[in-house]
Each structure stands twice: as structure tokens, then as C-alpha cells.
């Protein structure tokens, strides 16, 4: 049989990996980690990374899921050299190989009815035998190829399949445990396990990084590869990701979709850094640049044990990257959250200034956008608890006094606004908090914000003065 590569297989490329999701849902964090490990191993070895969409499940695969997977990969910045390739567009190729296998006696047509197979299974279970096909049709030549049938791979019956898993070490499965796998359905469509084999061969895949739930598929795929004379890649099966309760990660543990983490305000750098450490390590190092990940990553350092997802650690990493990445870069991601929350940022401070002001205060960009709305829009009401606490005593007098001083400023900058607050406190013979806190509630609507001088400059003179007057009127109305 001949190789039929969908792209030029550069002989100088010694490592070629792939990520091959099924488009039946979103890109979840487990899949994203598999993609990351596969991508890192290719980059570490100056190799190539292939994106393949395994959409043979025609009933469950959707264009929306495919688009979501590609969007997730792009957001994580995991670019591919080849692809995306779609299995549904390669059916002719798969069927060509199957037909050749039938001709060479490596596969055979099976005409057994569903009733016969169910009866066979029932008998085997009663005899406490492992259910398996009995090869009834292997030597049956009394049927026409036009009759309804499936095609089965003629699996070896002797010996065993042995492979060295790059993560788990030596794995051996006896061929007596394996069945004659169906490789083409009655409707003529090839099955998942067969398509994977042909794709890995045609695309020159040297290393297959995937979840441990695929271990049982591996011996079947290796036997097909051997039968068609294709090279056998190195397999690396990574462990599952659990929730913090030890159960398999699911929606009840919180977000599981990669793009949900985007929506919740996480930077891709934080999620990538978190995922790489979720089953792999380099000493005690916790924070890795992309370059460090590529330089250090090795499959034999990937843990065999399941990893527990810890949202608090992800938040810690996210705040680190919000603080440390260039404000211009963070601002680009922050902009999406303002739009998502319907906040018009055209009239207010630069988003880079928002990042600089709030980087130490916010764990997520969603929180940053929500908590900075007052810089761009008017708020309807004062926070009830903050107003009750700070709009009392001489608050109205303090606000009136500080408004006079702010109105008189010739320059609206950090030094001048800070001085106005300081002078007001001195003249009233009170602490800075007795002026600053009522002022904070007056101009932001809440009891939390960056330092007052930074906040006032960010909001702008006209808005500040109008909001102070509104607060004064509110206090008088409350006391009337």
C-alpha cells in the first residue's frame, strides 16, 4: 500500500505531532492540555504540529463545535503548521485502503445480522466467555459484495501487542483480548479507529499524545498499522484531570470549556501556564514563559497520576500575568470584557491606565471591567452599605469643602487633586479618611477604588464635580 500524504512530508522533520479533537462539543481543558503537550513536544524538537478534526461521528459533529475548537486553539496561541484536516473529506482515501486490505486478505466482509451477533454475545456470556466475534464470515464466500455488510479487520490471534508508552512505560496486551474490529460500517462509512490509523500514516505523525482513555484503542491501531506496513508512532497517554474532590472534572466543578475561561476573565498565558503544570513539572518552578515551556518540556516528565484542578491557583497565576504582562497587551484582552458587559469606553481613561490602576486589585479581567464601570458611565445608585457607613456626620460638609477646592484647581493631575483632599482634611481638622471615603463613595458609587488622586484623574474633572454635587444632594435628602 502507498502513502497518500495531504501535505509535503519534509524528511528533515524528525518529530510531527497532532491534536485530533472530535467536534461534538467545546474545547475542554483536558483537550487543551493534550493539545498543549503535543504542541510543546513538537516545538521542543523543532518539529511540526498538525490539527486534525475527527468528525466521522456525523450525527454528533457540528460546524459550531469545530469553530469553537479552532477559536479555542487560536485564543491559546497554539498555531499549527498543517491543517485543519477533516476526516469527512478523506472518506475516499480510507475506503481505498480498506478495499486494498480486503484484496490482500487483511480484512473481510461480514454479513452477520444484528440478531445473529446478539445471539452470539448471549451464548458467550452464558458460557462466561469474553464477548467477541466468532469469524463466521471470514471464509464465507456465498454472499455478494452488494449485500449489506460491514468490513472487519483480521486481527492477529497469536502473540501480543507491546509498546513503550512515553509516559507510562511498557504496555502489553494479548491479541486474544482483541476482536476483529469493524473498520467500515454498513452505510459505507469508515470507523474512528481505522481513520486515525490512516491519517497518522499519511500525515507522518511520529508521536501521538492523547488521553489515557485511548489506551485500549492503541493495540488495535498498532495491529492495523503493522498490517498495512506503516511505521508505528510513539504513544504518550496522559492522565485525566479531576476536580478538587478527586472526581473527573465536569461542569459541576465550574468552567470546563477553554472559552468559558476567556469569558470569566482569564488571560491565555495564565491558563496555558496552569495547564502545563497540571501533570508536568520542572523542579519547583511554577511560572513559565512560553520559551521556557518549549525548552524544558519532555514527555518522560509527565506524571502518570491524575491531576486535580485548583481554581485558586489559576486565579493566582492570572493576577500574576495581569500585573506582569505589558498593559497594552492586557488592555486588548480587557476590551473584550467591556464590550461583553455593554460598557462604552469611548469616554474615559485609556484602558492601559485602567490596567495600571487595577492590576493589584483584580484577579480577573471580568472583575476589572465590572469594577471600573464608573470610569466610563454614570451609576444609578450609591452602594447602600458604603453610603450608610460614609455618608454620615460631617460628610456633606467635607464633600462641599473638597468640591470647592477641586473646582478651583488650575491643573487636574495627581499632585493637585491629592493636595486638595489633604487641605480639606487639614482645614476640617479630621483625618484623610473622613474626606477621602465620602469622596470615594460620591465619585465611584462604592467604597472601593484605587487611590483617590488616581481615581479622580481617571474619571475626569466634570464628572467628578457633578458626582460630588449629586452625593451632597443625596445626603441632604436623606437627612431631611
Swiss-Prot record:
Cell compartment(s), UniProt: Cytoplasm
Reactions it catalyzes: tRNA(Glu) + L-glutamate + ATP = L-glutamyl-tRNA(Glu) + AMP + diphosphate
Pfam families linked: Anticodon_2 (PF19269), tRNA-synt_1c (PF00749)
Chain sites annotated for binding Zn(2+): 110, 112, 137, 139
Residues given in the record as ATP binding sites: 251
Cofactor comment: Binds 1 zinc ion per subunit.
Major location category of this protein: cytoplasm
Motif 'HIGH' region: positions: 21-31
Keyword Ubl conjugation part of the UniProt annotation: no
'KMSKS' region, short sequence motif: residues: 248-252
Alphabetical UniProt keywords: Aminoacyl-tRNA synthetase, ATP-binding, Cytoplasm, Ligase, Metal-binding, Nucleotide-binding, Protein biosynthesis, Zinc
Complex formation: Monomer.
Name assigned to this protein: Glutamate--tRNA ligase
Organism whose genome encodes this protein: Haemophilus influenzae (strain PittEE)
Annotated gene: gltX
Amino acid at each position: 500500500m502507498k502513502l497518500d500524504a495531504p501535505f509535503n512530508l519534509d524528511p528533515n522533520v524528525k518529530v510531527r505531532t497532532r491534536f485530533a479533537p472530535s467536534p461534538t462539543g467545546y474545547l475542554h481543558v483536558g483537550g487543551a492540555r493534550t493539545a498543549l503537550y503535543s504542541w510543546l513536544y513538537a516545538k521542543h524538537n523543532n518539529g511540526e504540529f498538525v490539527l486534525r478534526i475527527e468528525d466521522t461521528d456525523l450525527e454528533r459533529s457540528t460546524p459550531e463545535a469545530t469553530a469553537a475548537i479552532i477559536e479555542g486553539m487560536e485564543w491559546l496561541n497554539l498555531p499549527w503548521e498543517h491543517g485543519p484536516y477533516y476526516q469527512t473529506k478523506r472518506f475516499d482515501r480510507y475506503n481505498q485502503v480498506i478495499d486494498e486490505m480486503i484484496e490482500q486478505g487483511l480484512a473481510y466482509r461480514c454479513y452477520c445480522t444484528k440478531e445473529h451477533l446478539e445471539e452470539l454475545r448471549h451464548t458467550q456470556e452464558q458460557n462466561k466467555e469474553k464477548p467477541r466475534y466468532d469469524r463466521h464470515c471470514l471464509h464465507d464466500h456465498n454472499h455478494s459484495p452488494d449485500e449489506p455488510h460491514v468490513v472487519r479487520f483480521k486481527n492477529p490471534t497469536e502473540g501480543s501487542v507491546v509498546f513503550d508508552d512515553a509516559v507510562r512505560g511498557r504496555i502489553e496486551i494479548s491479541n486474544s483480548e482483541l476482536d476483529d474490529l469493524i473498520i467500515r460500517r454498513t452505510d459505507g462509512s469508515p470507523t474512528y479507529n481505522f481513520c486515525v490509523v490512516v491519517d497518522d500514516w499519511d500525515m507522518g505523525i511520529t508521536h501521538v499524545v492523547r488521553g489515557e482513555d485511548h489506551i485500549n484503542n492503541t493495540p488495535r491501531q498498532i495491529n492495523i498499522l503493522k498490517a498495512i506496513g506503516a511505521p508505528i508512532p510513539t504513544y504518550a497517554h496522559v492522565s485525566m484531570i479531576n476536580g478538587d474532590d478527586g472526581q473527573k472534572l465536569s461542569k459541576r466543578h465550574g468552567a470546563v470549556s477553554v472559552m468559558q475561561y476567556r469569558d470569566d476573565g482569564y488571560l491565555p498565558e495564565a491558563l496555558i501556564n496552569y495547564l502545563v503544570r497540571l501533570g508536568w513539572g520542572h523542579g519547583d518552578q511554577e511560572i513559565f514563559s512560553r520559551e521556557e515551556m518549549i525548552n524544558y518540556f519532555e514527555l518522560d516528565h509527565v506524571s502518570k497520576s491524575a491531576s486535580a484542578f485548583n481554581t485558586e491557583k489559576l486565579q493566582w497565576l492570572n493576577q500574576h500575568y495581569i500585573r506582569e504582562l505589558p498593559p497594552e497587551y492586557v488592555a486588548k484582552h480587557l476590551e473584550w470584557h467591556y464590550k461583553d458587559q455593554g460598557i462604552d469606553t469611548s469616554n474615559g481613561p485609556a484602558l492601559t491606565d485602567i490596567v495600571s490602576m487595577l492590576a493589584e486589585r483584580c484577579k480577573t479581567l471580568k472583575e476589572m471591567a465590572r469594577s471600573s464601570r464608573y470610569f466610563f458611565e454614570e451609576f444609578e445608585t450609591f452602594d447602600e452599605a458604603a453610603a450608610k457607613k460614609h455618608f454620615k456626620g460631617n460628610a456633606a460638609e467635607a464633600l462641599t469643602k473638597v468640591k470647592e477646592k477641586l473646582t478651583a484647581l488650575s491643573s487636574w493631575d495627581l499632585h493637585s487633586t491629592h493636595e486638595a483632599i489633604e487641605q480639606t482634611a487639614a482645614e476640617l481638622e479630621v483625618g484623610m479618611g473622613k474626606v477621602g471615603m465620602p469622596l470615594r463613595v460620591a465619585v465611584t458609587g462604592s467604597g472601593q477604588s484605587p487611590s483617590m488622586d488616581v481615581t479622580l484623574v481617571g474619571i475626569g474633572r466634570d464628572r467628578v464635580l457633578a458626582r460630588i454635587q449629586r452625593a451632597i444632594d443625596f445626603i441632604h435628602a436623606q437627612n431631611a
